[in-house]
């Protein structure tokens, strides 16, 4: 009874405009930042290294980027009202759900193979046709 009431209240605050994303994807997260009495949008662009799905209100994802040679990670609640929008820039071809190994890599070694568009993975593995 109480759980249903809590779920009904939480349902009002859940986002419905979420893009399909997973670990390895390059994303651009637009967050609302309040400075004094003004509010502005700040963009954080990087690679999703973890996507934790739990109860609808507790899902979170971690985005990592390297800024001026320093690795920066930021955790975002998926349904946060501070997130204005999430754009998926590219899909990374990874076989892991948590990419914490990227923390120890530098330079080109820390880059992920990017897939372009839907079905790009299928086209890459298709056998070439003889001419």
UniProtKB/Swiss-Prot annotation:
<dbReference type="InterPro" id="IPR038657">
    <property type="entry name" value="Ribosomal_bL19_sf"/>
</dbReference>
<dbReference type="InterPro" id="IPR001857">
    <property type="entry name" value="Ribosomal_bL19"/>
</dbReference>
<keyword id="KW-0689">Ribosomal protein</keyword>
<dbReference type="Pfam" id="PF01245">
    <property type="entry name" value="Ribosomal_L19"/>
</dbReference>
<dbReference type="GO" id="GO:0022625">
    <property type="term" value="C:cytosolic large ribosomal subunit"/>
</dbReference>
<comment type="similarity">
    <text>Belongs to the bacterial ribosomal protein bL19 family.</text>
</comment>
<comment type="function">
    <text>This protein is located at the 30S-50S ribosomal subunit interface and may play a role in the structure and function of the aminoacyl-tRNA binding site.</text>
</comment>
<dbReference type="InterPro" id="IPR008991">
    <property type="entry name" value="Translation_prot_SH3-like_sf"/>
</dbReference>
<protein>
    <recommendedName>
        <fullName>Large ribosomal subunit protein bL19</fullName>
    </recommendedName>
</protein>
<dbReference type="GO" id="GO:0006412">
    <property type="term" value="P:translation"/>
</dbReference>
<dbReference type="GO" id="GO:0003735">
    <property type="term" value="F:structural constituent of ribosome"/>
</dbReference>
<keyword id="KW-0687">Ribonucleoprotein</keyword>
């Amino acid at each position: 009874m109480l759980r249903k009431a809590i779920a009904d209240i939480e349902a009002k605050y859940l986002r419905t405009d979420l893009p399909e994303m997973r670990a390895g994807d390059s994303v651009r997260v637009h967050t609302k930042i309040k400075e004094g009495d003004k509010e502005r949008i700040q963009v954080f662009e990087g690679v999703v290294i973890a996507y934790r799905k739990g109860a609808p209100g507790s899902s979170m994802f971690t985005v990592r980027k390297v800024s001026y040679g320093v690795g920066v990670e930021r955790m975002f609640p998926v349904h946060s009202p501070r997130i204005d929008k999430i754009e998926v820039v590219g899909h990374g071809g990874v076989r892991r759900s948590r990419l914490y190994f990227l923390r120890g890599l530098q330079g080109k070694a820390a880059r992920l193979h990017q897939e372009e568009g839907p079905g790009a993975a299928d086209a890459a593995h298709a056998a070439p046709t003889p001419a």
